[in-house]
């Protein structure tokens, strides 16, 4: 009798264990993807993960090569309140922050004003504004320690997100995309943020939703130790009481092909999964799809929901057509997401102080 009970117990354990690992089980799928509608992109992702994590599959990928890359703005963090987080932050720093606004150099002030004119009046930004912004941001945050800057970013992230009710900037993440991140983590994937935004802004925002600080790649700015001054770092040795501070040097904007080069330098492996939302992510996607060793997949999120977000539907339609032609999987915010920012968040009109 004891042997029979032991056999039944072991059998039950084996059955329960095998069920808990079967990613296609409806209960498991519902646990991971409660914020999703059934859709082609989600089915494709689950099929992909099921396939490449199955040791018996010809497409099996060793766990050390389970590399996934994510853009940030517009991919898992909102970029429509009313523009990129880092643009909103610089506008505030230069034009509204009483601790800095009277110190801002004229070129930095001009850049911040161009952001304000863009978001409030619809005035187009100048060509190559991403580089102009980078140079201005380098000056605006120069002298801040990394800890001070991290705290500054997080304090701004606690402000109400313009254009929404019931949400701060920091809470403005796409909840369905966070479910994908958790799903991949639980299935042995190592995931990186590869963003065009300031690396240290991305660290502050992305670590709050589960990314490790050393898995963040972004636009690069100069650093130095606090007493280094103008000394060449090759000719200088920092003291024990020094801290690392931001310099006024803008080094690199991590967009388009720079994303590929940064991935190659910092990760050292070609991703097998890639997630993005814009032309700035296409090179990263193509780099992923060029990985001939393994089965790969790339996903583009389309901001096509003007009921729950401040979407430009004409632009969304153009992007969707382009991404389908490139053979990327399409994630539709309107059709595929049960919620975007959460059930208690409501889109409202933008409000600007007079």
Predicted features and spans:
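Bacterial N-terminal signal peptides that target proteins for export
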Residues: 1-8
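Non-catalytic pre-domain segments flanking phosphatase-related domains
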Residues: 4, 18-72, 80, 94, ...
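Bacterial N-terminal signal peptides
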Residues: 8-15
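Single-residue recognition of alpha-helix boundary sites
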Residues: 14, 82-86, 206, 292
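C-terminal cap/substrate-recognition subdomain and adjoining C-terminal extension
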Residues: 23-34, 50, 65, 148-354
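Electropositive phosphate-/nucleotide-binding environments in soluble metabolic enzymes
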Residues: 39, 143, 257
